[in-house]
């Protein structure tokens, strides 16, 4: 802030926008990161420092194995490569965007979570984490 310029990149998740069955703490934590980033972005407005929250969906990293998610539809059908996610994050950071959702499928997922009732999105989330 003292320099009048800076960039902050926080890592959220599409799980910030809708429930993650069997992983509620993860979803709640990522919702916090998204909300915190938004608040910080507004607090720093006019200082030259921007805050970006990158919200990827399923990404081909060691996380899926450690979280026991490799067998789920989410990681079988909708996984992105980490390089592609990183490129989205870098571009959003460079442009000073507040949030960035990586991938078309993930963007549609986030839009559906914003516009559809939980009675629709919750079963979708459950379907994605089932085998």
Q: Where are the language model's segments positioned?
A:
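Active-site helix of classical SDR
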Residues: 29
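A transmembrane-helix-recognition feature enriched in membrane-embedded lipid enzymes
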Residues: 96-131
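Active-site loop immediately N-terminal to the catalytic Tyr-X3-Lys motif
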Residues: 20-24
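SDR active-site lid
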Residues: 43-105, 119
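Residue(s) in the substrate-gating loop at a strand-loop-helix junction
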Residues: 13
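Helix-to-beta-strand junctions that scaffold the AdoMet/dcAdoMet cofactor pocket
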Residues: 1-3, 45
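Conserved catalytic-site region of short-chain dehydrogenase/reductase
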Residues: 16-18
């Amino acid at each position: 802030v003292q320099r009048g310029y800076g960039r902050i990149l926080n890592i959220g998740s599409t799980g910030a926008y809708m429930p993650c069955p069997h992983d509620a703490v993860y979803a709640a934590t990522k919702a916090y990161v998204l909300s915190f980033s938004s608040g910080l972005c507004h607090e720093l407005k006019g200082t030259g420092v921007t805050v970006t929250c990158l919200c990827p969906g399923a990404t081909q990293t060691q996380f899926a194995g450690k979280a026991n998610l490799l067998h789920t539809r989410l990681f079988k059908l909708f996984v992105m490569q980490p390089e592609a996610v990183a490129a989205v994050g870098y571009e959003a950071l460079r442009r000073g965007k507040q949030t960035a959702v990586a991938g078309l499928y993930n963007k549609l997922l986030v839009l559906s979570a914003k516009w559809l009732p939980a009675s629709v999105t919750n079963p979708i989330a459950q379907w994605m984490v089932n085998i």
